[in-house]
């Protein structure tokens, strides 16, 4: 007569990105003997509808960004000494929580710092493993590259250089909000000082005759 196993496997570890879940089988006992264990993993976003997670193999589940938002459980099976296959399931883990990943990459400014010219802030190299929900660009200027002031007249990736920017350095300020609502602000490298372009005088010279 088959003897049912006593005890149950359980999950150890913290359900958090960059940590790991480990199957603890130390409490499992079977009077018919315990053969080699096999472990498969399942996951669910609701702890009700479980799906096989074939990406994970073995007793340790390292938690990465792709695991965030899911709960996991392990299905442990073995064949006892009389050839009966036994299946045990752990209680589900807590939902794996996110750990904020830093924004990577850089903002690159193209264009010449010259009056009448245009600078463009390129954000194609900006990356966040947590995903990017929104990205906004602002511009700042500084006389000596130390105290930076926001330029309120523009909030696009393009910035036209007017006479008022001559003698100042320019940089782009980029606000990145990830899909978990965390905001990170990064800056481009500052440009060289914006150079002046000579503006021709306007108007005419009038010669008036004075006296007789």
Q: What is the meaning of each model-derived region?
A:
Residues 1-212:
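Ser/Thr/Pro/Gly-rich low-complexity disordered regions
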């Amino acid at each position: 007569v088959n003897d049912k196993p006593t005890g149950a496997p359980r999950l150890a570890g913290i359900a958090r990105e960059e940590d790991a879940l480990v199957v603890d089988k130390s409490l499992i006992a079977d009077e018919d003997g315990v053969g080699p264990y096999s472990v498969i993993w399942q996951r669910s976003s609701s702890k009700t509808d479980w799906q096989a997670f074939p990406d994970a193999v073995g007793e340790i589940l390292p938690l990465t960004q792709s695991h965030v938002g899911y709960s996991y459980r392990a299905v442990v099976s073995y064949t006892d000494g009389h050839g009966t296959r036994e299946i045990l399931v752990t209680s589900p883990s807590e939902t794996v929580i996110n750990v904020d990943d830093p924004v990577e990459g850089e903002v690159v400014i193209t264009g010449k710092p010259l009056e009448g010219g245009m600078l463009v802030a390129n954000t194609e190299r900006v990356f966040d493993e947590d995903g990017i929900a929104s990205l906004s660009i602002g511009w700042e200027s500084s006389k000596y590259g130390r105290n930076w002031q926001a330029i309120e007249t523009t909030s696009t990736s393009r910035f036209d250089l007017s006479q008022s920017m001559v003698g100042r350095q320019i940089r782009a300020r980029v606000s990145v909000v990830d899909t978990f609502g965390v905001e990170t602000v990064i800056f481009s490298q500052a440009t060289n000082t914006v150079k002046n372009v000579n503006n021709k005088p306007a108007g005419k010279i009038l010669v008036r005759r004075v006296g007789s």
